[in-house]
């Protein structure tokens, strides 16, 4: 732990000076008043001070006026957009790596590399080996540590690694490229589970679909922007341009994310009391204790039919999503005879339609639930099975039509219909087990990632010798979705599972530890230790509630990471 703290302190010192210049420029541009001195002279923390300045400047813009839970959703949307845009870079760049090509200006370019399409497919899919490995561990980490920091770490480091990828290509080292891809997958594998961990504290039950789908729509918006932008940059600038652009954007986003997001409403220094009370009252008692490896009901999770319904649905959706993300431009080039520069924008339309459907579906799903028109279980099943059923049907049309126009229209309709399913399986974890939502997301997304691993090889096997192999590719995608529809319709549930809450003795044991020592047993700060229920026979003198110290500077306290022994008095205290 000491080595981690030393590394963290060194990191603060390294970023302190450039962050100071950035915040000074922002303050000058907005006319913000200089903040109060955050710490005593001689004990200054550069990163804390300048992050507080950034937060104060942001509070004078639209960010300060935005409800904090929706600010989280919007920034998360941008983060997912960058993350999934990064995944489009390789697919666009590889089309110029293994054969000669003519750019839009008529100039013929000789390919720079001697790799075959098979070798490039292996390097591209290596991302998913890393992505798969961190799924279940990421779910546990997101339940154990502040999930907002974990999410920012995944996007920021993944973006930085994207900047390094062109170097691996230029030195013509397939091992280095594969290593960077695997490492990218490792760090970005934490993002989905971490975001589910964030919504555990920030999403009121009747807003779960809206908030979660707003955030996750970034995944599909990432493809909407990433496919045409990557194709444009590869065609008009260079094959390395998309890697650099997305890498820089991701690093900038990560800095903003760390400055303005917090683990819980109680930790946020500038959230309105109205919003804070609304969220906490709606969610109810959220345990301050966090699961340990021994306390997680692994057997119940693995044997739960509703959990497996989510997993099967996740795999089905992942199969088609990665199929299109990795091969849509290739399909349009080989099967439909389109140029890469021309097909980029057209390839984005299905994902654009899906993004719109996801947002509308989230609003409609929560409307049906909040007005008690349908039960949560009914909403999840109808949206998931309707979306997947429509996608499977249109995929059959794509597989067997001989008209290019019909194929494109059916592909747009298929991907668009799948948007309804996001209000089904993709938020279902929060319904059945909010305490373990991050872990369930890691579990289901990990198995779903197998689709990303196997899809490139299956597609290559079908299409290696003839463009007619694309019929088999889309037929298989349709059958996988019909399987997902059937399984989810039979076994899915929207009700809280009996194993989803901790046992009373585990809950009380951790609460008593917090009360007596003032230190959260999870290893990071938590101040709002309000105990509303006590086990029978326990003296009421154990009931306690930590209160903020009077006069606490909310900006300074929000970044205070050096807790002292004894009761934590700072309501915004958070420690990694």
Curated annotation (Swiss-Prot):
- Summarize the record's disruption phenotype note: Defective preference between different food odors. Abnormal repetitive turning behavior during male mating.
Superkingdom: Eukaryota
What InterPro entries does its record include? MFS, MFS_dom, MFS_Na/Anion_cotransporter, MFS_trans_sf
Bilayer topology = Multi-pass membrane protein
Pfam families from the entry? MFS_1
Q: Kindly list the GO molecular function terms attached to this UniProt entry.
A: glutamate:sodium symporter activity; L-glutamate transmembrane transporter activity; neurotransmitter transmembrane transporter activity
Q: Where in the cell is it found?
A: Cell membrane; Synapse
| Chain spans, region Disordered | 25-46
Stretches in topological domain Cytoplasmic = 1-69, 143-150, 196-213, 261-305, 366-381, 428-437, 493-576
- A biological process term (GO) from this entry: negative regulation of turning behavior involved in mating
For this record, the Gene Ontology CC terms, alphabetical, are: excitatory synapse; plasma membrane; synaptic vesicle membrane
Q: Which residues lie on this side of the membrane: Extracellular?
A: 91-121, 172-174, 235-239, 326-344, 403-406, 459-471
The UniProt entry's sequence similarity note says: Belongs to the major facilitator superfamily. Sodium/anion cotransporter family. VGLUT subfamily.
Q: What's the protein name?
A: Probable vesicular glutamate transporter eat-4
Q: Which organism is it from?
A: Caenorhabditis elegans
Which gene is the coding source of this polypeptide chain? eat-4
């Amino acid at each position: 732990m000491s080595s981690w703290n030393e590394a963290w302190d060194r990191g603060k010192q390294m970023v302190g000076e450039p962050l100071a210049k950035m915040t000074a420029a922002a303050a000058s541009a907005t006319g913000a008043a200089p903040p109060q001195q955050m710490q005593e002279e001689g004990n200054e923390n550069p990163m804390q001070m300048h992050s507080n300045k950034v937060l104060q400047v942001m509070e004078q813009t639209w960010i300060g006026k935005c409800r904090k839970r929706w600010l989280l959703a919007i920034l998360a949307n941008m983060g997912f957009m960058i993350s999934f845009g990064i995944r489009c870079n390789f697919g666009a760049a590889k089309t110029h790596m293994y054969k000669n090509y003519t750019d839009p200006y008529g100039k013929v370019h000789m390919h720079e590399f001697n790799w075959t399409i098979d070798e490039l497919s292996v390097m591209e899919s290596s991302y998913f080996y890393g992505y798969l490995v961190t799924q279940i561990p990421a779910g546990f980490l997101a339940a154990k540590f502040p999930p907002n920091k974990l999410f920012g770490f995944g996007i920021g480091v993944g973006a930085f690694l994207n900047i390094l990828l062109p170097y691996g290509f230029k030195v013509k080292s397939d091992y280095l490229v594969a290593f960077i891809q695997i490492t990218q997958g490792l760090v970005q594998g934490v993002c989905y589970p971490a975001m589910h961990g964030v919504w555990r504290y920030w999403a009121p039950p009747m807003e779960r679909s809206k908030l979660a789908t707003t955030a996750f729509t970034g995944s599909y918006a990432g493809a909407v922007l990433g496919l045409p932008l990557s194709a444009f940059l590869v065609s008009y600038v260079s094959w390395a341009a998309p890697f650099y652009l997305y890498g820089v954007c991701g690093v900038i986003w990560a800095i903003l994310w760390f400055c303005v997001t917090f683990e819980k409403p109680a930790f946020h220094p500038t959230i309105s009391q109205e919003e804070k009370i609304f969220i906490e009252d709606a969610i109810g008692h959220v345990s301050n204790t966090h699961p340990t490896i021994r306390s997680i009901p692994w057997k119940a999770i693995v044997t739960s039919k509703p959990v497996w319904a989510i997993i099967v649905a996740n795999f089905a959706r992942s199969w088609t999503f990665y199929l299109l993300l990795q091969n849509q431009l290739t399909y349009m080039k080989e099967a439909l005879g389109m140029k890469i520069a021309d097909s980029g924008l057209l390839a984005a339309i299905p994902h654009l339609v899906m993004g719109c459907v996801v947002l509308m579906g989230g609003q409609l799903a929560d409307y049906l639930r909040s007005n008690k028109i349908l039960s949560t279980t009914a909403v999840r099943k109808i949206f998931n099975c309707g979306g997947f059923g429509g996608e499977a049907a249109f995929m059959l049309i794509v597989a067997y039509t001989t008209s290019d126009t019909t194929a494109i229209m059916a592909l747009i309709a298929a991907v668009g219909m799948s948007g309804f399913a996001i209000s089904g399986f993709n938020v279902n974890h929060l319904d059945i087990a909010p305490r373990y939502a991050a872990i369930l997301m890691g579990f289901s997304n990990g198995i779903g990632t197998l689709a990303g691993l196997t899809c490139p090889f299956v597609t290559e096997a079908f299409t290696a010798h003839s463009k007619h192999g694309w019929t088999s590719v889309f037929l298989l995608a349709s059958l996988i979705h019909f399987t997902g529809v059937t399984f989810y319709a039979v076994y899915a549930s929207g009700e809280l599972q009996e194993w989803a809450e901790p046992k009373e003795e585990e809950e009380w044991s951790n609460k008593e530890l917090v009360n007596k020592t003032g230190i959260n047993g999870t290893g990071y700060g938590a101040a709002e230790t309000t105990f509303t229920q006590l086990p029978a026979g326990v003296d009421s003198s154990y009931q306690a509630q930590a209160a903020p110290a009077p006069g606490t500077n909310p900006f300074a306290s929000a970044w205070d990471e050096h807790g002292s022994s004894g009761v934590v008095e700072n309501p915004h205290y958070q420690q990694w």
